[in-house]
Amino acid sequence: MASVMQKLITPLASGPAEPPRNKVTIVGVGQVGMACAVSVLLRELADELALVDVVEDRLKGEMLDLQHGSLFLKTPKIVADKDYSVTANSRIVVVTAGVRQQEGESRLNLVQRNVNIFKHIIPQIVKYSPDCILVVVSNPVDVLTYVTWKLSGLPKHRVIGSGTNLDSARFRYIMAEKLGIHASSFNGYILGEHGDTSVPVWSGANVAGVSLQKLNPDIGTDKDAENWKEAHKMVVDSAYEVIKLKGYTNWAIGLSVADLTETLVKNLNRVHPVSTMVKGMYGINEEVYLSLPCVLNSSGVGSVINMTLTDGEIGQLKSSADTLWGIQKDLKDL
């Protein structure tokens, strides 16, 4: 006797189901991982979302919670497992796993604790999705993106750190608030390390093509009577402030990662300040990952924009690179 399903549906296509075309995997279902997952889902960027974590109950709970919202989403398949086979055929893999930054702890203090975790994670990802683009979010993100590149064996253009995409977004928000305009109408970049040695590019800051440095040649310096450099200090302090108030940061980084994911999946060729291999640029001679304005597309980092930086800004970038190299050179087992 025919089942309800057999009576209801007449199949036409035969053979195996089509593999996913825009599968996104999130490794780590903590606060940041789930903010990334929800942001990707709400922007309708994936035809399959996979979640991976070592804490099985939490992982299953998050999967079920998202699946129960399927009616309100456009992602037909949401899966989760601690086994990395669930991530197979991913286009984008977002790595948020790692130990969390503590209040007052600098991002660079986190590094060796997270390196040991990555030695398990990264080879598993590449085993099941050898053609993926890896987006590293875990802190300290620049060093861990370098670690990911070394452990993965992937070409450098397919290993990206979320870098200063969020720092730049914070900068644009803070500056725009001071100017009474929307964040998208203030153009400015934070480059270098995602963290304490980040570099504000005051020479390029503008609104509608009007250079702020031309209006105020001292902008961003100690001589500036208007003290605009306070905006960059607020960017550097912002994560620490949010962590102090609520224990972690997650929503802004989740939105930032979804923004990057959209550019990669849709082959948009948009420019984002993300962490990439900078050896040979701006006089940097070491293999370090730092944020520069990168053209992102379906290949990963398609190219890097050569910004016209001042000597002071280039000096700050080199200093940022030196800070990171000081950590990297002591890493073990890479």
UniProtKB/Swiss-Prot annotation:
Q: Which organism is it from?
A: Danio rerio (Zebrafish)
Name the UniProt record assigns to this protein: L-lactate dehydrogenase B-A chain
GO terms under cellular component: mitochondrion
Q: Which UniProt keywords apply?
A: Cytoplasm, NAD, Oxidoreductase
Spell out the InterPro entries in the cross-references.
L-lactate/malate_DH, L-lactate_DH, L-lactate_DH_AS, Lactate/malate_DH_C, Lactate/malate_DH_N, Lactate_DH/Glyco_Ohase_4_C, NAD(P)-bd_dom_sf
Q: Which GO terms describe its molecular function?
A: L-lactate dehydrogenase activity
UniProt subunit comment: Homotetramer.
Q: Which PANTHER family match?
A: L-2-HYDROXYCARBOXYLATE DEHYDROGENASE (NAD(P)(+)), L-LACTATE DEHYDROGENASE B CHAIN
